[in-house]
Amino acid sequence: MKIFNKLIFLIIQCILIISVTNAQVDCGGTDNPYPIYNELPVLINQTTYGKLYKIGPPDNLINIIELYGTPYQRGLAQGQLLKSEINDIFDNFFGYITVMVNELVTKYADYLPKFLVDALEEGGVGLALDITADLTKKYTPKSFFEEMQGIADGSGIEYKTILRLHMFPELIKAACSMVGAYNSATLNKGLLQLRALDFGFDPMNPLRLHPTVMIYHPESVSAGGDGGHEFATLSWAGFLGTLTGYSQHVGICEKYWFGYNGTSSREGIPFHFLLREIIQFDESIDEALNRIINADRTCSVFMGLGSNQTNTFKAVEYSYEYVRVFDDQTPFPSYVPTPSAHPVIQDVVYIDKFVQPSNHQCLASVLQKSLGSIDVTSLINAAAQLQTGDIHIGIYDYQQNQMYVSVGTQSGPYPPPSNFTIVPAYARQFIQIDLNSFFNQ
């Protein structure tokens, strides 16, 4: 009977895959027209504990910063090398985030803890961020506070302001998409991971201004550091949490879980700090899952975990109440009938930018067309066709130890004039970063 049921399930999945593949799906976007930029980064400046590079064409420059030493020393180096950029973001951040959070509370008040909604109404975003900082403090490793103090000392910005900025991911709802493709699904049979961050892209968003790839070289515990291995994150100047990140062992990504209807809390470790701990300390998906399961969890997000050890990718439903894990053979989501638009695809795990369960056929259709030959270009075009990844996109090639990044328009006057046009990351040129030249120094 079990064999019969499994056979029926496989037949149904095949029918769903064929129907999605053969359907005329209007994704809304078109392929990305630009070649990948692959020139080397240029060293701009350095301090005792850091080096600053620029990479990209003149109209699409990205910072790369290497950070060495203890948490405080790494923070100090970032604050010194990116002082003007950090001040630029922080000077404009709270006005923008106030508008964004107020709009989100109007839409999603039912998904936020009541005390946070009350705090936003009574004391504004500042009070809500302060309460979040207080509730998460005892669950957050002290190394994060030391690194924030270093950023404050290096940049000249008040520590409390630095701390507040690092609490906002707990309040904001980012759409985002993720894909992990591996083994038979990819051209080189290695693991490729796509992370597309959709995060309120408009000309007034200061988080678009100074995109930065941060490459960490942690000092060993025996030498007074926090230990762990080297890793890279794609973020913006002054932010040390991780929403997009990769090491030679694991890679991570995330997406807000809009459909979660269970209990939430803010007493726990901020999810973006936990994600950074994964890429700094964990060497496999199992180790990352162990960290997730045993963590004091807060809000609800989907997480993506890739592993060089097993050459696989898994998606995680991460919430205060429970953790669920999905691989390429697990119907997604598990608690409702699998939408026909989200068929199981061998050696591919994916979640699109829409509220889940999603009935949008685009991503599955695009992946099916490239199945067996998925490469970096395939994932670049998948993001462009789905029109996902407005602030930034990261693609990790585990086999070659490469990171490909694209960012939304970061140059031009700020505040921008009313007629200022910006271009989202998915429609801009991708930049290749060879992590072999930065890791294992």
From Swiss-Prot:
Signal peptide limits: 1-23
Protein's cellular compartments: Secreted
Lineage: superkingdom: Eukaryota
Keywords of the record: Glycoprotein, Secreted, Signal
Glycosylation sites: N45, N261, N308, N419
GO terms under cellular component: extracellular region
Induction of its expression: Down-regulated by Pseudomonas aeruginosa, PAO1 strain and up-regulated by Pseudomonas aeruginosa, PA14 strain infection.
InterPro entries recorded: C45_proenzyme-like, DCD1A/B-like
Major subcellular location class: secreted
PANTHER family associated with the record: PROTEIN DCD1A, PROTEIN DCD1B
Protein's name according to its UniProt entry: Protein dcd1A
Protein species of origin: Dictyostelium discoideum (Social amoeba)
